[in-house]
Amino acid sequence: MLSFVDTRTLLLLAVTSCLATCQSLQMGSVRKGPTGDRGPRGQRGPAGPRGRDGVDGPVGPPGPPGAPGPPGPPGPPGLTGNFAAQYSDKGVSAGPGPMGLMGPRGPPGAVGAPGPQGFQGPAGEPGEPGQTGPAGSRGPAGPPGKAGEDGHPGKPGRPGERGVVGPQGARGFPGTPGLPGFKGIRGHNGLDGLKGQPGAQGVKGEPGAPGENGTPGQAGARGLPGERGRVGAPGPAGARGSDGSVGPVGPAGPIGSAGPPGFPGAPGPKGELGPVGNPGPAGPAGPRGEAGLPGLSGPVGPPGNPGANGLTGAKGATGLPGVAGAPGLPGPRGIPGPVGAAGATGPRGLVGEPGPAGSKGETGNKGEPGSAGAQGPPGPSGEEGKRGSPGEPGSAGPAGPPGLRGSPGSRGLPGADGRAGVMGPPGNRGSTGPAGVRGPNGDAGRPGEPGLMGPRGLPGSPGNVGPAGKEGPVGLPGIDGRPGPIGPAGPRGEAGNIGFPGPKGPSGDPGKPGEKGHPGLAGARGAPGPDGNNGAQGPPGPQGVQGGKGEQGPAGPPGFQGLPGPSGTAGEVGKPGERGLPGEFGLPGPAGPRGERGPPGESGAAGPSGPIGIRGPSGAPGPDGNKGEAGAVGAPGSAGASGPGGLPGERGAAGIPGGKGEKGETGLRGEIGNPGRDGARGAPGAIGAPGPAGASGDRGEAGAAGPSGPAGPRGSPGERGEVGPAGPNGFAGPAGSAGQPGAKGEKGTKGPKGENGIVGPTGPVGAAGPSGPNGPPGPAGSRGDGGPPGMTGFPGAAGRTGPPGPSGITGPPGPPGAAGKEGIRGPRGDQGPVGRTGEIGASGPPGFAGEKGPSGEPGTTGPPGTAGPQGLLGAPGILGLPGSRGERGQPGIAGALGEPGPLGIAGPPGARGPPGAVGSPGVNGAPGEAGRDGNPGSDGPPGRDGQPGHKGERGYPGNIGPTGAAGAPGPHGSVGPAGKHGNRGEPGPAGSVGPVGAVGPRGPSGPQGIRGDKGEPGDKGARGLPGLKGHNGLQGLPGLAGLHGDQGAPGPVGPAGPRGPAGPSGPIGKDGRSGHPGPVGPAGVRGSQGSQGPAGPPGPPGPPGPPGVSGGGYDFGFEGGFYRADQPRSQPSLRPKDYEVDATLKSLNNQIETLLTPEGSRKNPARTCRDLRLSHPEWKSDYYWIDPNQGCTMDAIKVYCDFSTGETCIQAQPVNTPAKNAYSRAQANKHVWLGETINGGSQFEYNAEGVSSKEMATQLAFMRLLANRASQNITYHCKNSIAYLDEETGRLNKAVILQGSNDVELVAEGNSRFTYTVLVDGCSKKTNEWDKTVIEYKTNKPSRLPFLDIAPLDIGGTNQEFRVEVGPVCFK
């Protein structure tokens, strides 16, 4: 399209050339006469008065330049060209005849009358330029200009459609391995390892925090009689009795009960290392230690399983062949991520049912007295108790009411004789006498017998929080908690440089121990494997917290217990004696009764390893004894025959690395096509579903006890053992003197796990103590799960091309290809038989998105292949170098395009597939519902005292009772001053052999055993389940270069590129010629009267007459020797032509304006609605005319412009199809195309009025090129016909299919790029009423729209009707 400036320039060129031509013609028609001689100069006459205006004479010679005049006023508007210069009158006069001969000189004449006005003087110098006048009116349209020069090349067009995929080339050489991939997602936990041997006793755990006090248990049944209590406090001294006679010496009394244990003596000297004791029983596995510090990166692991074949990638450009590097091994597995944060404490559970009554525990240390609880509510009145023995006289009560009149007293002494009076009547009751004096307190009565147990009081209110209790004994190990959820993956570390391949690393750490399996039958003793390599030294740990107080040395053996002497009378307390020297250790006495359990002692130092004794003969089996303590770990028995598979055990700790087995013999090569030998072990698959429980194997005979093996890694905590039977009650030892309470020591190092202490009475709940200082770092935890694969090593050298591997697993279908060229519709193919349902393959990872391939036509279904066994995944090849680009193959013979095959009948449901892989652990579920109410809680604490009972009758005074029983021991008194050292006691009898001490710390490793014989080969294991699908392999090697294909057909012409930037400015043009004369200016102001000049000389002969009348035509006469722009001409001969030029310019300007700002009319259509919207943003959405292919406007189309969305919408013609109901289908369950089959081949059309189908197709093609998005909806009106979802079945198998413009079929489900969406679905059930389903399809591939046809399925039945309403297609 020519720009406005270009057109205007062409027009001016044309006008200018026309003016030049006219000028040359005019110049040729005027003859120039000969120049006459110059006359003499006359004298200057006096200046006469100013005469009248004379007739214009010939122009005189040029005068001297005048001074520049002031700027003139603005002239009237010029013509559009601004080049209409005026020709000046300045020049030689035209037309004078030849000059006559000179006459004789006459006498001076008289002063003549004033001469006529002189001719107009020459024009002065140009004045200052005036202000620019307003733009003139637009001139008429000029003739079309010459074609302009080629514009700058446009921007490159959009890439053409992808060409046909060539045949696969031959396999290229292996490429260099790619850079290391990103760290993969953490894999699933591997399968549980086999159960490991029981580990050695774990290190004693730190004392657990004291548990909260439990709720009081129900009152147990009456216990057995308790041990003999401690000697009570001395009773009050009785009155001294009279000395009895000395009795005979009695026999020696029995050995008195042992007093309470004395306070620990001073530490004895460190004893010599004792012989190595028998291996202690395997203690319960300690809790899992905290994660150790990250170890050094392990060595490179073996290569993983080969991945499944990836999708065919896009053909790469030919790369330069690289130098083959050394083959890299996969990097080591990374360290596990950090342990996740501990979860929040869960809500307190409901009260559980009361457990069975436990066996009576040993008496615990007495707790500190708790603070008094709040007073409980009064209990109910108790039943009336038995009559108590007479109590002590009470204190005097308040005065009672007056008693009845007493009986007459005893007769008094005779009074003086009175006069005899008359006997009066009985007197009234006298007033109350004064109270008597309070009598002395009576003796205390005997304590009454205990009353019956009152009924259970109501639970008291909670008491105040008591003081923090002393640290209780270590509780039994708790049952293992459920494993916590896997923590979140740690942040990804920065990628390191690729290292050189390291040597093959040692085998992994031992697996975690599983549950104890049934003992196998005894097998032959296997040879010990060779020692494993020492691991690399770990990095130094961080500076630990300051250690606690060192261990106390072991206590010396107990001295002899002396016999108790006869009890003497209590003397006064003597002064403490000085401390005697320690006595020598006596021989051990016989076993005394079992004492109370003392607090656990601190660990002694480890003794040296003693020699292993010879094994004695096996004794006959004795009767089953009580459950003893766990025995020492025996040597592994010989392998028994494999029992049937047990239930899956809990995940065990990693096992000790086994020795490398000898290489087996190479098997014979199998036939091609069967699966090859197993590849290298792949990455751990997902955890499979648990297998069925195997039957219990027979119990194997016990193997011979082997030498004690080195302690294994710390095991996970074992399950809680059964409670052992209570030991016999020991006698109380003599009480030691109480020592001063020592200052609380710092937290000691972790001691060995003590035996379970006796359960003390439940103390009051202590206040939460402050957090203790951080303990020292724990021992190294068990080896964590394997980390993710390390980075790829240096590329290996390219290997030779191997034989073709077995067929890979069929990949998922590729994305639809690009649309092929439209072929002729072929005949419909036969329906293939239904294939057998294949096994459900594991879903492959998403392939790389391929370029859009051509849409293939549905072929006939081939016969089903038998499902081959799943091949083992080969090792991944290293990434090959990209092969050189293949030559294009010969074009294949164009096959006839068949009709789209009908949709096949839905096949029968496939056989149940194998169980899928176990998914990753789910997230923690929501908290469950509250459990049912628990059983009644145990008895509460005793209630407050009941209300006082009714006052009993006063008892008789009792006899003085015997001395009361000793009261309960009072609280511990404060520690008395240290006594003086006592004399050295006599050696006591030898104690019995003490119980087996706690297992000492691990002794030094024993000498290495000799290598055992090679074990028998194990039985062949059952064939494993098929492995899970491996990870994607590395990208396959590029194929060899294919042949070059033929030159593809030229793509469609791309849309016009955006307008290029303005070119550089051209050189400045030559000065234009002067324009036409301007219009006549206004008359100048009349000049002032000049002064009269002196008389001049006589003038020359008179001038020739005025010129003749102009000869017509364009008056560019010869007078126009010079162009001037400021001298108006008086002749009006130019004006009519000026108007023609002006009108032409104006018309041309209007046409250019309409090109730049289209009006959307049929004569002046826009290209798209977007152009209209940009030109007229104020316009409203409506119907307008557009011409997408530009050029002639005869094929413009009328569309609806939606200015709110910027869309150009084209209506279908017609919009509605008539209702259809009489179509009988040839085959049931087939989609039937409405336009192709039912309407006899007429598809939806989008013709605008006055435009043919071919012209409309061209306009639509341009619209698709100009748009980058398109959308359209279609409404399916139905009566008893399903359009999308069938509500009865919930399936979409009856949904309609739509055909797009490029023959693509748009469906209800499948590839999301070819599925439509449903806005309203009223046709989902059959109601005998008309309803509708509105379908919409939006795409960024405008080539797929508009819809050309629709294929419903659920039609043709009785009382079924449908019609279609096609919505507009909108491009944007």
UniProtKB/Swiss-Prot annotation:
For the modification Allysine, which residues carry it?
90
Keyword hit for Phosphoprotein: no
Q: Which residues form the propeptide?
A: 23-85, 1126-1372
In what residue span(s) does the Fibrillar collagen NC1 domain sit? Answer: 1139-1372
One molecular function GO term is: identical protein binding
UniProt cross-references to PROSITE patterns, sorted A to Z: NC1_FIB (PS51461)
**PTM-bearing positions, type Pyrrolidone carboxylic acid:** 23, 86
List where the motif Cell attachment site lies.
Answer: 783-785, 828-830, 1011-1013
GO terms under cellular component: collagen trimer; collagen type I trimer; collagen-containing extracellular matrix; extracellular region; extracellular space
Query: Which residues are recorded as modified (5-hydroxylysine)?
Result: 183
Report biased composition (Pro residues) as residue ranges.
59-77, 1095-1107
Q: Where is the composition biased (Basic and acidic residues)?
A: 147-161, 744-753, 1011-1022
- InterPro entries referenced in this protein's UniProt entry, alphabetically: Collagen, Collagen_superfamily, Fib_collagen_C
Positions of glycan attachment? 183, 1273
What keywords tag this UniProt record? Calcium, Collagen, Disulfide bond, Extracellular matrix, Glycoprotein, Hydroxylation, Metal-binding, Pyrrolidone carboxylic acid, Repeat, Secreted, Signal
Q: Does the keyword Repeat apply?
A: yes
Q: Provide an example Pfam family for this protein.
A: COLFI
Family, according to the entry, reads as follows: Belongs to the fibrillar collagen family.
Q: What does this protein do?
A: Type I collagen is a member of group I collagen (fibrillar forming collagen).
Q: What is known of its domains?
A: The C-terminal propeptide, also known as COLFI domain, have crucial roles in tissue growth and repair by controlling both the intracellular assembly of procollagen molecules and the extracellular assembly of collagen fibrils. It binds a calcium ion which is essential for its function.
Q: What is the name attached to this protein's record?
A: Collagen alpha-2(I) chain
Give the originating organism: Rattus norvegicus (Rat)
The major lineage groups are: Eukaryota, Metazoa, Chordata, Craniata, Vertebrata
